[in-house]
């Protein structure tokens, strides 16, 4: 009897153990495979922006490459301010922050910081006509800066030297909005990083940069302080690869190099021309662009003639697109002074050059090569490419070619080329100017679209109020 009880007890225990084992096996979840890289960001010309041509920005392009490197789908999540960005990262809503944020002591304490993407200076910004401040101790008014920004940390450090220094913080505005307020005279001073300042003074030429408050501050991505070892390891490997391959140098050139040159008079004149001259020719630019962004075509025409259909040059070029007589014949144009024919001919000539360029030149840089060819001739650009290759540079990278083109006016170099002497430095300036005009046209387009959206939203609200009012009146007329 005892043996029987022992056997039954043993069987029961074994069954129980097996049941527990099975139950435990059932409740262990399968690891969820990650499919998306969620990136917190802020809107900004050099950070992340959406246009009619798609999404752009230094941080966006780097994030796109990083997601591709990780074999994940990229999801950019814009937030209203830095505080919301921090909360999103801390809560796990996003995997990292790519928002043009600077390396600061406070951020190092709270988060893990990635490697430097580029470096900026912090500059004091004021409006033309305001007395030029020598340093922050001579300011006539308070400084207004963004809440949680690196500028607040800089001011806190400066306050130790200048105890009377005071500032105001804006949580719901970004640097671009504060600089617009400077231009309108609503505030007197703000602080911006040098890149953001240089980009925005193209649209707000009244802006001026005062003393540099902090030099060569690294712009980095922010990662969570915990459970991000693998992501940090992947980011560092990715960064080293992109640095060696020239991607970082290319993006720096793309977003920042051409904006360093600034001409107040020219910028004001261009903004006036957008209002007064461009409307006459806008439809023609759009109609004949044929695959080219019409704003690049319009920017080229402005660089050539300032949108003057009767423009003439002692060298024989004429019209809105300043075509030579041989080029006009080549593209089938009879009257170079007819603005419509000129636009049609200039667009065809540019497209012909684009189609002629080697396939090795990346799509996002082909226009700059084509414009340089439009300016000094395709042969000279080919000479510069061969010269770049002989110097160990990349002949298909615009950042390298713009370093070589100016050498074409030096005997030491041009005597080795097929087509000889050329003013290559003028070609570089020519392309940079067109890129600035193009960026301004994109900005104006975006501003106009915002106004259209705001007007439509206001009309919808008014319509909803009217409908709501009618329904209220109808319900009031019903029997009780």
Curated annotation (Swiss-Prot):
It catalyses: Exolytic cleavage of the (1->4)-beta-glycosidic linkage between N-acetylmuramic acid (MurNAc) and N-acetylglucosamine (GlcNAc) residues in peptidoglycan, from either the reducing or the non-reducing ends of the peptidoglycan chains, with concomitant formation of a 1,6-anhydrobond in the MurNAc residue. Residues 260-480 are annotated as: LT domain. InterPro entries: Lysozyme-like_dom_sf (IPR023346), MltF (IPR023703), Solute-binding_3/MltF_N (IPR001638), Transglycosylase_SLT_dom_1 (IPR008258). The active site is at residue 304. Residues 1-15 form the signal peptide. The keyword Secreted does not apply. It is a peripheral membrane protein. The keyword Calcium does not apply. GO terms for cellular component: cell outer membrane. SUPFAM superfamilies: Lysozyme-like, Periplasmic binding protein-like II. It is found in: Cell outer membrane. Its EC number is 4.2.2.n1. PANTHER family: MEMBRANE-BOUND LYTIC MUREIN TRANSGLYCOSYLASE F. Murein-degrading enzyme that degrades murein glycan strands and insoluble, high-molecular weight murein sacculi, with the concomitant formation of a 1,6-anhydromuramoyl product. Lytic transglycosylases (LTs) play an integral role in the metabolism of the peptidoglycan (PG) sacculus. Their lytic action creates space within the PG sacculus to allow for its expansion as well as for the insertion of various structures such as secretion systems and flagella. The N-terminal domain does not have lytic activity and probably modulates enzymatic activity. The C-terminal domain is the catalytic active domain. This is Membrane-bound lytic murein transglycosylase F. It comes from Shewanella sediminis (strain HAW-EB3).
